[in-house]
Each structure stands twice: as structure tokens, then as C-alpha cells.
């Protein structure tokens, strides 16, 4: 079972990197014109993932979201620090980008991260605001993101 979990984690990592590479290539070719399309696609994917999360691992608040992220981080090979977790706020730091968009732009980061914001919002059944304080996409040493209920 442990070997299967590691294999699943490696496949998830590869899929996320593939999403990042595709988005990065699209962004490099079409510039800012690509951002609304990337945001739309990622947002819709986040909604679908949020529906699955709510069915498989129901959440009530941001504390539950933090627990789900903490559970998934090692599977994804990520080092994640939960800075704050309350009923209304989930604040994290990560040492690397699971999408592999280092050296791109904050706008691309925001477009891709719309998936997480929409996943969380859908799972909670309410709108969620996302603030990206730091991003390796723009050369920061870590990513720092705050998700909060609106």
C-alpha cells in the first residue's frame, strides 16, 4: 500500500508539472492574452476538484482545509508550513512551486492558483479570497499564500 501511495504521489506531481509546463508555454507564446483562458480553465478544474473533496473528505472550515493540505503535501513531495489556520483563514508557505513556474510572473502564478482558490471555495460552499504574498514565480525564495473566507 505504501508503494502504491508513493506511486500515486509521483503521478500527481508529474500531472501538476505538466499543467504548469503547458500553461507556461501558452503564456510564453501568447503573453497576457493567455491569462484569462488559463484562469478560466484552472478555476473550472478547481470547482470540480472542490466537489470531489466535499464528497470524499467533507470540510467545514479553513481548519479542515489545512488538514487536507497537510495530508497531501508529503504525497506531493512538498514541504509546506501552515503559518495560520483558523475557521476563516488558511495561510501557508511552501519552498517550491509544484507547478514548476519559477522565473515566470505573478500573473501566471495567480492564474494557476485560481484552481486552489476555487477548489477551497467550492469545498466550503462559499467564496474564498486568495492573496499571494510571495511567489517563486517572481524570484522569491518561497511561496506564501493566504486563503480567507469572503
Predicted feature locations:
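N-terminal accessory segment detector
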Residues: 1-91, 95-111, 126-144, 148-150
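Active-site helix/loop of acyl-thioester processing domains in fatty-acid/polyketide metabolism
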Residues: 110-124
Amino acid at each position: 500500500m505504501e508503494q502504491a501511495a508513493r506511486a500515486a504521489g509521483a503521478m500527481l506531481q508529474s500531472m501538476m508539472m505538466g499543467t504548469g509546463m503547458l500553461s507556461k508555454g501558452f503564456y510564453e507564446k501568447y503573453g497576457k492574452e493567455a491569462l484569462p483562458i488559463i484562469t478560466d480553465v484552472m478555476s473550472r478544474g478547481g470547482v470540480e476538484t472542490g466537489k470531489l473533496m466535499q464528497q470524499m473528505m467533507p470540510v467545514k472550515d479553513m481548519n479542515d482545509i489545512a488538514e487536507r493540505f497537510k495530508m497531501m503535501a508529503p504525497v506531493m513531495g512538498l514541504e509546506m508550513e501552515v503559518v495560520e489556520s483558523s475557521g476563516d483563514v488558511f495561510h501557508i508557505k511552501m519552498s517550491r512551486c509544484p507547478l514548476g513556474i519559477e522565473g515566470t510572473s505573478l500573473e501566471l502564478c495567480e492564474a494557476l492558483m485560481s484552481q486552489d482558490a476555487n477548489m477551497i471555495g467550492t469545498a466550503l460552499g462559499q467564496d474564498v479570497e486568495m492573496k499571494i504574498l510571495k511567489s517563486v514565480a517572481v524570484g522569491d525564495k518561497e511561496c506564501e499564500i493566504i486563503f480567507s473566507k469572503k
